[in-house]
A protein has these predicted regions:
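Active-site-adjacent loop/helix segments that line or gate small-molecule/cofactor pockets in enzymes
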Residues: 1-46, 63, 202
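Glycine-rich loop-to-alpha-helix module at the N-terminal edge of alpha/beta enzyme cores
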Residues: 3-11, 16, 58-141, 145
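Short clusters of hydrophobic/aromatic residues that line enzyme substrate/ligand-binding pockets
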Residues: 9, 42, 67, 159-161, ...
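Electropositive phosphate-/nucleotide-binding environments in soluble metabolic enzymes
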Residues: 16-20, 24, 44, 68-72, ...
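Hydrophobic alpha-helical segments, especially N-terminal targeting/anchoring helices
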Residues: 51-52
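PLP-dependent aspartate aminotransferase-fold enzymes
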Residues: 103-209
Length: 209
């Protein structure tokens, strides 16, 4: 049973022959801008384990599926939903699943105030874009403070907010009004700065911005 198996490499090389053939097809059909961190082609998964098309078994450390692959309760829920309908844009028609999930999120979100509302985005960058729009609409302020070292996404606005400039080469001009403060991380204090001075140092960087 894959769920309880240990990692195992059965091919002489990685990727194996079947995986290499699919990776070559990927390279021919999709842009290289969509990088790939590891030379495997997944065939199936159970729990935290995945098996590739050549039979190699890996422990998935990414953690996006934090309940694991093919979790039976989730599989049954997907099957049940697919039997009813599988797509309905929420700005065209209302469906209960969206409402139930929003209600659940609002019931547990640690946000002050009696009124809470939630909506769902397709990606982190889209969520960040909407968070900025909501903040600007509510405050009437034009500027944004972001931290050094931060990654926010690869849309035009979130690239501007992201500290790593490799993502933004050749993509300008960018929106104005984005200012960067030092992220409070004791391990990266300026050389020779004692820890007891670091808190005021990082707080003052926000005031300076």
């Amino acid at each position: 049973m894959l769920r309880t198996d240990l990692p195992e490499i059965v091919t002489e090389t990685l990727p194996g022959p079947k995986a290499q053939a699919l990776i070559d097809r990927r390279a021919a059909a999709t842009p290289s801008a969509i990088g790939c961190a590891y030379p495997l082609v997944i065939d199936r998964g159970e729990g935290a384990m995945i098996e590739d098309v050549d039979g190699n078994k890996f422990l998935d450390w990414v953690g996006v599926l934090n309940i694991g692959y093919t979790q039976p309760e989730v599989v049954e829920a997907v099957k049940e939903q697919a039997d009813k309908y599988f797509h309905c844009m929420f700005n065209i028609g209302t469906h209960e699943g969206y409402v139930k999930l929003a209600e659940k999120l609002c019931s547990i979100a640690p946000v002050k105030g009696e009124k809470k509302k939630a909506f769902f985005a397709n990606s982190g960058a889209e969520a960040d874009e909407n968070a900025v729009k909501i903040a600007k609409a509510f405050t009437g302020r034009e500027n944004i403070i972001v931290f050094s070292g931060a990654f926010h996404g690869r849309t035009l606005l979130t690239m501007s907010m992201t500290a790593k400039k490799a993502y933004a080469v050749g993509m300008g001009p960018f929106p104005y009004g984005i200012f960067r403060a030092k992220f409070p991380y004791y391990y990266r204090n300026p050389e020779g700065m004692p820890q007891e001075d670091a808190c005021s140092y990082y707080v003052s960087s926000i005031y300076d911005v």
